[in-house]
Amino acid sequence: MVVSKKLMKVGPWGGAGGHPWDDGGHSGIRSITVSYDRSIDSISVEYDRDGLTVPGERHGGAGGTGNHTTQARTTSIKLSFPDEYLTTVSGHYSPIAHGGSPVIRSLAFRTNREAYGPFGVAEGTPFTFPVDGGVIVGFCGRSGWQLDAVGLYVAPLRPERMSDRVQQLGLSAYRAVWQRIGRPQQRHEPVEQLNGNAQIIHKT
C-alpha cells in the first residue's frame, strides 16, 4: 500500500459539545477501539507511522451514557495492516435528550476487505464518507463525556487521482442540513481549498 502524503480533511459530523481533538494523519490505521451504548462513548485508534505503531489517545468518556448509569460495551477492530485499510466511515448523530447537543449515536467502518458495525444506536441524522481510490489515515473531532463529533483525514492511494477526487467532491459531496423549523430546507456546503489541500467543513 502506497499512500500519498497529501491529505484531505473532511468533517466533522456531529455536535459542538466537548473539546476539539485531532490525531492528525498517519501512514495507516492498525486498529480501532469503540465503546458504545445509546451513543458512542469513546473511540481510540492505533496508527502506523512509517512502520512504527503509534497508540492513539482515547477520546470520550470512561463508559456508559451521559449520566453513566449504564456500562458501555467495547469492541476492538484489528485490521490486517498493511493489506487491509479503512475506506469508509459512516454513522448517525442526534441529541440523546430533548434539547441537548447532538452526539455521535452510531459508527460503522468498512475496509477494502470487511464491514464492521454498526456500533451504537442508528438514530438521527445519517452521514457517510466513502473513499474512492484512497484510504482513511486519521481521525479528529470533539469529545467530552461522549464522542460529540468525528472527522477524517484521507490520503489517495495513487497521488495522480487526488485532483480528480477533489473535483468530484466539489460537485457532489455536500452536506444536507435540514432545518426543523417549518418546512425542511436543504443547504449545501462545498469543498474548500486550503494550501492546496481539499477540506470539507461541515457546520452544525
Annotate the PLM regions:
Residues 1-204:
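Lectin-type carbohydrate-recognition ectodomains
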